[in-house]
Structure formats: structure tokens, C-alpha cells
């Protein structure tokens, strides 16, 4: 461990905003937990009163002040910390840390940056330095030029040739970014981008390529491995925060996956990152060509997703690594004993964003390289069909799955497919039902045929269910397969009985038939520790794809179930996660077994350490 680390300053992320939400409450809480375990005094700077990390007992001292250079310097002057953690408060903390470093404030007070150095952070944040650094090891980046004036920007765009991509340095959630087909569009976007950042990057457009992400961790002894691989359902051109994301990767073969994994470890080593980082690639499967789009040398939204997807506590381990521990040393502590081992998944997860665009009159529903989504969900299952259907129900906007959403209809399908909006996934369903081929849809959307083929399976099975007129006529094998493919009782009732109204009676008829045939979901564990003792874990999900329970229910013990609030949305955010966490903690203190049901990967409530059992699944009558 870093010598003489008696007091450490942790920079939080401040107010929630698009591109920076509850995931940093989760990562910051994990970092503070790691410090407490080491007996290190922690000082937190975060003005967000709705977070878990600012609650009593998490940090030793909390300053509800802005995360800015002026205020943080005053806190450093008063508290005299030995070290500072910058990677757990998102872009806000990273930018503040970079300013503290460049202004000499950290050196002035003898504060050591723990984990990844500020120099390495600057390599990833300054687009020009980033490209030059990766060129040293012959890693491909988009043809680009960093500029700081409109005159240079126009010259760069003309040299590269339209269409071009514009990105802002030190920006959050793709702010000020976009693809420009011509100079008129470019002038408008570049002017807007310079309002957010003094430097922008003009680069070749790779729109339509696959977007692949890796979460990688490295310690000071240079042990490095991939914790999770993730694939964006939507092609490049749509921000990863706006895209459906699936883990593990689905459409890559073993050779392609191995190549990108090896490039990831090569990249993190050359940049000198110590801790966790997220690497994003553009990938062309037709040519095996790639570009490194971005590296985040900090905990991110994708890090929280990877942690919940795999059960590997990335933020906790990253904090320990920042303190100087190696991954094998963390493993020997038994917290967790998986720190030295890459997680193995026998299931799929799917992240789906939630938008609240209808609350703002005149706002464009088109999605692209800048984030508009305000929340997200994560579904877990044994097939893509299952997780996409579960996930679309979890969003909480009245959808019943991929099919069966009678209130959604599109007049111009070609436009809806080629110019994506927040409803494009439902346009895919209508297109398939209207006879569009997978080849035609791929041409319009550039979504990989692997995903489209799985979605077509759902549409085809809807037609199979619609051939029955009575619930009691559905054979057991047909009903079971429908559940395996993620169909809810409501969907089955709609396709078989075609009723009007709220369908409560028909829904119960399907439920009764299913139970009569013994078609019930199994409770399965996620192996959070990748060890010889998976039966010890309490991270659970439900699926119809396999038989048998991995848990025994509490029989002679009192227990309390806490229902989480699901995806963040306007009017329901991290404050309800605070309520959920405090509820399970209070239940535990009173001697009850605490059970949490929630499906938001950004939250502290979906950390399996917070309760006796975590069910990462739907909040619905069918799951009750």
C-alpha cells in the first residue's frame, strides 16, 4: 500500500446531469468503502445531498461544496490530505483534478494523485495528445486533427473530406459532438462545440462501423486483463449512452475478440493507466479493420454496467489498486477473491437507455453522438431474445416487449430506420412484421445481422402464438418456448385472445395455464467471485431458460422485500435509491433478512453487498 496514506481526499461528481448520473454515487461509495477498510481517513467533496456517499457513516468528513479548483484548494489547505482520488467522480472530478495539477496546487500542498497519473489522464482527455501517444505503438485512431480555432477547423475538415466527425475535448456525454455531411453542417456544429471546449477534434467519419467496448484493469505490477467486453447494438454514430449495449460481445468471432482484447492491454500499458479504464473501438468486420475511438481513464457509466454485468466490483478493486495493492494481494484478502481472475459469464445482459423527450415541447427525437437519455436499465437472461424483451418492459414507458405494443405505429418506416429516434427498436419490429428482410433492415440501419436475426425469431414466434384462439389450446412446449424467448403473460394473452381493455382477466388466464403446466421461472445466481464457492453469492436473477433453483427460500426467518425505483427519469432519480438503500440497511439492523428487487445498473441499491439477497429483475406482477 502507498506509504503514510493517513488521509485521502475523494472528489465526487456533483449534481446529476445527462451523461453523469448515479453511477458515480456507486463508484464513489465503493472507493470510500475501500478506504474505510484500510483505516484511512476519508474526506469527500460532493454537493449532491441526494447521494448515498454523502450519507452519515460513509466518509469520515463531507464537504457539500462545488467540485471546483477554488473550493477544493481551500479544503486541501484546511484538511492537508496525503492523497487524492480523481477517478471516482466522473468528468467533473477529472477536470478539477487536472486543473489542480496544472496550477501546481497539488505539488504546493504535497498531495499525491493516487492511481493513474494526471499526465496519463491528459493523454486520454486531450485529443491531440491521445492520437500522438497511440501512434507511438502503431495503434489505429481515426484520421483526425485537433484544432483551437474556426479557421483551423475548416481547413482540417476540407483536408480530411466530408463527412467528418466533430468531438470536444474534456467534454461529457458527447457534448458538442456530431457527424457533418457538408460544410454548412460543419460550421454550425463547430461553432457550437467551441462553446463547450477550447479544443475540438475533426476526424474521419466511421458511421456504420460496429462499436465495441472493453473494461480493463491494471495494477502497478503490470498485471492487466479484460473484465468485460460489450457490444453496442447500434452502430457507430450513436453515442454509447444512447445505444442498447449487450455483454458479452455477440457478433464477433473468437479471432476478432482476441485481437481487440490484446490491443486493449497494449493500450492501457502504454498510456500508463493504473486502475480501471474503458476503451472504445470502431470495428469493421468485413475487413477486420479497427480504430480506437476513446479511452476513459476513470470509472464511467460503462464501468458501473460492467460491474453489475459480471459481479466484479470494479470501483472497489480500482480504489485498492490506487492505494498500491496488486490484484493478487487484493485476492488474498478475500474481498473479493476474484480480483486476479477475469469473470466468466454463462448468461447475457442488455442495457437499454430511457429517454423522457416527450416532456419537452419541440425537442427532436433523433438520437446521435450527443446524449439525451436520462436513465438506463439492465436485464439478465440466457438469450438475446429474453433480455431484449425483459429490458424493453423494464424501461417503464408502457411497452410490453419487442412486439405487442399496439399504440406504436410508424408511417415512414424507411425514415425511422435510417434516421434513428428513441423509438427505433419498435420500428424494427414493425418493419419485420411488414415483410422487410434482414438484409434491407441492415442496409438502412447498419445494425449487425446477428441481432436482427434474433429479433426476427421474436416476430416469428408472435405469429406462431397468434395461430391459437384459446389459452388452454397452447401446448406446453409452445408456451414454455414463448417464456424462454422473453414473452410476458400479457403479450401471450394479447396474441392468443386479442382482447380489449386492460386485459387483467386474460393475463390471469395465461398465468393460471402456465402454472398448471409447471412453467415457472428459475432463480439463478451470478457468480460474483469467480471462485470454487458460487453458492455463497447473493446476486440473483430469474429466467425460464433453465430448470431448478440456485437458492433456498428463507423459511424460519423474518425478511423484508424492498422494491427499487427502476430507471432514472425526470422526477425520479438518485434520491429514491437513497431511500431504498436506507430501507434495506434499517431492515438489517432490526434483524430482518433484507431483499432488494431492482434493475438499475447505476445504483448503490443494486450493489449485492448492500442486502442479504439482490434480485436483479423486473418489478412486475408476473415476477411477484
Where does each model-flagged region fall?
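ATP-dependent carboxylate activation and anion-phosphoryl transfer catalytic cores
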Residues: 2, 6, 12, 25, ...
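Glycine/threonine-rich flexible loop motifs
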Residues: 17-27, 93-97, 569-579
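Short, acidic/small-residue loops that bind anionic groups at enzyme active sites
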Residues: 33-39, 103-121, 589-591
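A conserved helix-loop-beta module that forms one wall/lid of the active-site cleft
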Residues: 54, 108-177, 611-614
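Periplasmic-binding protein-like
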Residues: 82-88
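Short Gly/Thr/Asp-enriched flexible loops that form oxyanion-binding sites at enzyme active sites
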Residues: 91-109
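Extended, domain-scale alpha-helical bundle/helix-rich regions
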Residues: 482-485, 491-498
Amino acid at each position: 500500500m502507498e506509504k503514510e496514506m493517513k488521509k485521502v481526499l475523494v472528489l465526487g461528481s456533483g449534481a446529476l446531469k445527462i451523461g453523469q448520473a448515479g453511477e458515480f454515487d456507486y463508484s464513489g461509495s465503493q472507493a470510500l468503502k475501500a478506504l474505510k477498510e484500510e483505516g484511512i481517513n476519508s474526506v469527500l467533496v460532493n454537493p449532491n445531498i441526494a447521494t448515498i456517499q454523502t450519507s452519515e457513516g460513509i466518509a469520515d468528513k463531507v464537504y457539500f461544496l462545488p467540485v471546483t479548483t477554488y473550493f477544493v484548494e481551500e479544503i486541501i489547505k484546511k484538511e492537508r490530505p496525503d492523497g487524492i482520488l480523481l477517478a471516482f467522480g466522473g468528468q467533473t472530478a477529472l477536470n478539477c483534478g487536472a486543473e489542480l495539477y496544472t496550477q501546481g496546487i497539488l505539488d504546493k500542498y504535497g498531495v499525491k494523485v493516487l492511481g493513474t497519473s494526471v499526465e496519463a489522464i491528459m493523454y486520454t482527455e486531450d485529443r491531440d495528445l491521445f492520437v500522438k501517444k497511440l501512434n507511438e505503438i502503431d495503434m489505429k485512431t481515426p484520421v483526425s486533427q485537433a484544432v483551437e480555432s474556426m479557421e483551423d477547423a475548416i481547413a482540417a475538415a476540407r483536408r480530411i473530406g466530408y463527412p467528418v466527425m466533430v468531438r470536444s475535448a474534456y467534454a461529457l456525454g458527447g457534448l458538442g459532438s456530431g457527424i457533418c455531411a457538408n460544410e454548412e453542417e460543419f460550421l454550425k456544429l463547430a461553432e457550437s462545440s467551441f462553446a463547450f471546449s477550447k479544443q475540438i477534434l475533426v476526424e474521419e467519419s466511421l458511421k456504420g462501423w460496429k462499436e465495441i467496448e472493453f473494461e480493463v484493469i491494471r495494477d502497478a505490477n503490470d498485471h492487466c486483463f479484460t473484465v468485460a467486453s460489450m457490444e453496442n447494438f447500434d452502430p457507430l454514430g450513436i453515442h454509447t449512452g444512447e445505444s442498447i449495449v449487450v455483454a458479452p460481445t455477440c457478433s464477433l468471432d473468437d479471432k476478432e475478440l482476441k485481437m481487440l482484447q490484446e490491443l486493449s492491454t497494449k493500450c492501457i500499458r502504454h498510456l500508463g493507466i493504473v486502475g480501471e479504464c474503458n476503451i472504445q473501438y470502431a470495428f469493421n468486420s468485413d475487413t477486420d479493420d479497427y480504430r480506437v475511438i476513446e479511452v476513459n481513464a476513470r470509472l464511467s457509466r460503462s464501468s458501473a454496467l460492467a460491474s453489475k454485468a459480471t459481479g466484479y466490483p470494479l470501483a472497489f478493486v480500482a480504489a485498492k489498486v490506487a492505494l498500491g495493492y496488486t490484484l493478487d494481494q487484493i485476492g488474498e484478502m478475500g474481498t473479493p477473491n476474484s480480483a486476479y481472475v477475469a469473470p466468466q459469464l454463462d448468461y447475457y445482459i442488455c442495457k437499454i437507455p430511457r429517454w423522457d423527450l416527450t416532456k419537452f415541447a419541440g425537442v427532436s427525437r433523433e438520437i446521435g453522438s450527443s446524449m439525451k437519455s436520462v436513465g438506463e436499465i439492465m436485464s439478465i437472461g440466457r438469450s438475446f431474445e429474453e433480455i431484449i424483451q425483459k429490458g424493453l418492459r423494464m424501461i417503464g414507458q408502457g411497452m410490453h416487449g419487442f412486439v405487442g405494443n399496439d399504440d406504436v405505429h410508424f408511417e415512414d418506416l424507411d425514415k425511422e430506420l435510417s434516421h434513428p429516434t428513441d423509438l427505433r427498436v419498435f420500428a424494427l419490429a414493425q418493419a419485420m412484421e411488414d415483410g422487410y428482410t434482414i438484409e434491407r433492415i441492415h442496409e438502412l440501419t447498419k445494425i449487425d445481422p446477428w441481432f436482427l436475426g434474433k429479433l426476427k425469431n421474436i416476430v416469428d414466434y408472435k405469429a406462431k402464438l397468434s395461430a391459437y384462439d384459446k389459452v388452454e389450446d397452447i401446448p406446453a412446449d409452445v408456451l414454455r418456448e414463448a417464456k424462454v424467448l422473453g414473452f410476458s403473460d400479457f403479450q401471450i394473452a394479447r396474441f392468443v385472445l386479442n382482447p380489449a381493455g386492460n386485459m387483467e382477466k386474460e393475463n390471469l388466464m395465461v398465468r393460471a395455464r402456465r402454472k398448471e403446466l409447471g412453467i415457472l421461472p428459475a432463480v439463478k445466481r451470478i457468480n460474483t467471485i469467480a471462485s470454487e464457492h458460487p453458492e455463497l453469492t447473493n446476486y440473483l436473477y430469474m429466467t425460464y431458460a433453465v430448470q431448478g433453483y440456485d437458492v433456498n427460500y428463507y423459511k424460519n426467518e423474518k425478511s423484508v422485500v424492498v422494491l427499487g425505483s427502476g430507471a432514472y427519469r425526470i422526477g425520479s432519480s438518485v434520491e429514491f435509491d437513497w431511500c431504498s438503500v436506507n430501507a434495506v440497511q434499517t431492515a438489517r439492523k432490526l434483524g430482518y433478512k433484507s431483499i432488494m428487487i431492482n434493475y438499475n445498473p447505476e445504483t448503490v441499491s443494486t450493489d449485492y453487498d448492500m442486502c442479504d439477497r439482490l434480485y436483479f429483475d423486473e418489478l412486475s406482477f408476473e415476477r411477484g
